[in-house]
Design a protein with these regions (language model features):
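N-terminal targeting/anchoring "stem" of glycan-biosynthesis enzymes
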Residues: 2-566
Length: 566
């Protein structure tokens, strides 16, 4: 039994010894395999880490480059012009946000706009627009009994109709100097004088200067100087016949010193309305150098070389070049773009008397500007004869901020990839005001981005000539949007697109009063409701109707004598 036990014990010892030997061998194999796996894992993790490090480095470089590039563009684009630098503080200001909740909703919604993005989403109904055609350029016969002998000379800014009414010679207009814009441009610097005179020769006799025997007269001393204050804004033709005409016969000359919106209100005879349209839409052609640079601007925006529509033909004439834009810049089809006139310059902001959440510093700054440039308005404020900021906003008298414009475009369905040409002068508040816009719409360009400094040099310090370039880019755009329908450039572009657009020139015109009412609910309104109300607001302005009484024919030319309905 002891032997047996010994055997068993020995067997057991051999068993356990053998078992222990197998464990030693298995442990060595697993250890080697584990080490191999560990080395492979470390290699993979190291490789992935290198990729992440390289990717991070590249993103940092690209981000730095984009920030530097965008920063330089924005500094160049939104910087204050030198001629008003002393009036506007140049230090960086904090970003101005008035509607944080709506802006966040717009930011979340804009990606969905890309799915069904179509830049021409607000075309006017073709079957209605096609029935209206320009007709003010049809020649008139001189009425029987009307003499070709003229009653005298009129020195006037924009009164072709007055010269025709009073049977007088019209002296080429002289532009008044503005302390705001500091522009010395005259008529011949912007428009082709000879073409203007030739085109209207059957309607009005136009001369470039007074005859020598009248040049030496002291026009004010003889009582022939008439200022804007002497004529009521809505004076009728009868006023000019009863008051101005006898003065013209007596002295042989009348100088209207300033003529803003005079003889521009209903009721006007059909033939005078027709003449006003003929002058505005046909007789005024930009000088060749403006046409040439305007053509270059449009071609570079579109990345396309040829004329595309009737608006190109009327605005650019023979100056739509056929040479390539650049070797690598010509596309098979043109880039579509939306032109936006952001009328948020300091003069507009100050004159509106609105509050834009800029705090006490902004209020003091705007008040100081008004005291220099708008003394009459300043006096009204002191006498409590002006609207409060809240009243101005509720009545739709405040220009849209860049933030409000971005929210509106998002509600209308425009995606973040929309190519936007920004017209206008320098945005009040600079980059701090534009950040909310460019975050939603990064593809924003201006003429300063598109044209080289040498190409812009001839127009430097001539705001009227720079505005002519903006007019061309806006008028020929696939879509034109405005932030203030009362501004002169927006009104003229709107009318020009209606008159010459031939059914393919959609324009977005917000009703500022309605939009202000919608925005007043910004803390509670849901995005779907906001979007539908904004779209309805714009679509209702797309209705094709004849010009109502009292509306400007330059902005709404669908009226007898200007456009004819067939």
């Amino acid at each position: 039994m002891g032997k047996e036990a010994a055997k068993k014990g020995g067997g057991a010892g051999r068993y356990y010894a053998a078992k222990g030997g197998e464990n030693n061998v298995g442990c060595g194999k697993r250890h080697a395999l584990f080490c191999n796996h560990l080395r492979m894992a470390l290699f993979v993790f190291g490789l992935m880490g290198s990729f992440f490090l390289l990717d991070s480095l590249m993103l940092t470089v690209i981000h730095h480059f984009n920030l530097h590039r965008r920063g330089s563009l924005q500094r160049r684009r939104w910087i204050v012009p030198q001629n008003v630098e002393s009036e506007i503080p140049t230090e960086e200001r904090a970003e101005k946000i008035m509607y944080a909740r709506l802006l966040a909703l717009a930011s979340a919604a804009i990606s969905k706009n890309e799915i069904h993005d179509s830049i021409e989403r607000f075309n006017e109904p073709y079957n209605q627009t096609s029935s209206w055609r320009p007709c003010s350029d049809r020649e008139n016969q001189i009425p029987q009994g009307r003499t070709r002998t003229r009653s005298g000379y009129i020195l006037v800014c924009n009164a072709v109709a007055v010269a025709a009414l009073l049977n007088a010679y019209l002296v080429i207009p002289k532009f008044l100097y503005s302390s705001v814009w500091k522009d010395t441009s005259q008529f011949g610097d912007i428009y082709q004088e000879d073409f203007f005179m030739s085109y209207l020769k059957n309607d009005v006799d136009i001369v470039k200067e007074l005859p020598s025997h009248l040049q030496s007269l002291d026009i004010e001393a003889i009582g022939s100087l008439i200022t804007d204050n002497d004529i009521r804004k809505e004076s009728t033709p009868e006023y000019f016949l009863q008051v101005v005409f006898p003065l013209l016969l007596k002295n042989g000359v009348v100088h209207f010193y300033g003529f803003g919106n005079r003889l521009a209100f209903d009721p006007l005879p059909w033939d005078l309305q027709k003449l006003r349209c003929k002058c505005n839409f046909h007789a005024l052609k930009y000088v060749p150098r403006i046409q040439e640079i305007g053509s270059l601007l449009v071609r570079r925006i579109r990345k396309h070389n040829s004329s595309l529509n009737m608006l190109d033909e009327h605005l650019l004439g023979k100056h739509m070049p056929h040479a390539p834009v650049s070797r690598n810049d010509t596309c098979t089809s043109p880039v579509k773009y939306l032109a936006l006139h952001m009328r948020f310059e300091m003069d507009m902001v100050a004159y509106s008397l609105c509050d834009f959440d800029g705090g006490e510093n902004e209020r003091k700054e705007l008040q100081a500007y008004r005291e220099v440039h708008f003394p009459t308005l300043t006096m009204q404020i002191k006498n409590n004869n002006s609207l409060s900021p809240e009243e101005s906003r509720s009545l739709g008298k405040c220009p849209l901020t860049p933030e409000e414009a971005a929210i509106m475009l998002t509600a209308l369905g425009y995606g973040s990839r929309t190519y936007i040409y920004l017209a206008g002068s320098r945005i009040y508040g600079g980059q701090s005001r534009m950040l909310s816009f460019t975050r939603l719409y990064p593809n924003v360009i201006t003429k300063e981005d598109i044209l080289t400094p040498s190409e812009l040099a001839p127009f430097k310090n001539f705001s009227s000539q720079l505005a002519a370039l903006d007019f061309i880019a806006c008028a020929t755009a696939d879509v034109f949007a405005m932030t203030d329908s009362g501004s002169q450039l927006s009104s003229l572009v709107n009318g020009y697109r209606i008159y010459h657009g031939r059914d393919h020139a959609p324009t977005i015109r917000p009703n500022k009063k309605r939009f202000a009412r919608i925005l007043s609910e910004n803390r509670t309104i849901q995005w779907h409701d906001f979007r539908e109300r904004v779209r309805k607001m714009v679509q209702e302005n797309q209705r094709i109707i004849a010009r109502r009484k009292g509306r400007s024919i330059y902005r709404l030319p669908r009226t007898p004598g200007c456009m004819c309905k067939y």
